[in-house]
């Protein structure tokens, strides 16, 4: 073993298997790039991102942990979201949930 080496099983690692997902279109209406991280509650992302926030409540980006998606100014892109797991409680961000999801 090499210090810091990560040993994984052969094959592909599947993320978020069995969790509900949804695909939404997002537009950055700001004049600056906006980046959203993998575990950020997407409905509370930067207000310059235009999308169906009610639909996105309780979801985050369906990307590997530690990654982010960058939205360039004026850019429209489609992203896949995955339901927040665990106890499905959200605190912080813009303070719009502050507890259990309904």
Curated annotation (Swiss-Prot):
Keywords: Cytoplasm, Hydrolase
Location in the cell: Cytoplasm
InterPro entries: Urease_beta-like, Urease_betasu_sf, Urease_subunit
GO biological process terms, semicolon-separated: urea catabolic process
Main location as per UniProt: cytoplasm
Class in the EC hierarchy, top level: hydrolase
A Pfam family of this chain: Urease_beta
One Gene Ontology CC term in the entry: urease complex
GO molecular function: urease activity
Pathway connected to this protein: Nitrogen metabolism; urea degradation; CO(2) and NH(3) from urea (urease route): step 1/1
Reactions that this protein is recorded to catalyse: urea + 2 H2O + H(+) = hydrogencarbonate + 2 NH4(+)
Alphabetical list of Gene3D superfamilies matching this protein: Urease, beta subunit (2.10.150.10)
Documented EC number(s): 3.5.1.5
Subunit organization: Heterotrimer of UreA (gamma), UreB (beta) and UreC (alpha) subunits. Three heterotrimers associate to form the active enzyme.
Family: Belongs to the urease beta subunit family.
Entry protein name: Urease subunit beta
Organism: Bordetella pertussis (strain Tohama I / ATCC BAA-589 / NCTC 13251)
